[in-house]
Amino acid sequence: LKCNKLIPLAYKTCPAGKNLCYKMFMVAAPKVPVKRGCIDACPKNSLLVKYVCCNTDRCN
């Protein structure tokens, strides 16, 4: 699986066991991602932070 990184057009290949891509952003600024990468399980959203996870190449 390949996931986008925060830098535009950059991506990385996920290590074994991390089979989800995620995008994290602040609830107050939903159009501006704060963090992107590979993850093993989708974290829960909170009042301040929202996570979007997916499982296809570079879907984040």
Swiss-Prot record:
Any single GO CC term annotated in Swiss-Prot or TrEMBL for this entry: other organism cell membrane
Record's keyword annotation contains Oxidoreductase: no
Signal sequence extent: none
Main subcellular location: secreted
Disulfide bonds: 3-21, 14-38, 42-53, 54-59
Family to which the UniProt record says this protein belongs: Belongs to the three-finger toxin family. Short-chain subfamily. Type IA cytotoxin sub-subfamily.
Name of this protein: Cytotoxin 5
Species whose genome carries this gene: Naja kaouthia (Monocled cobra)
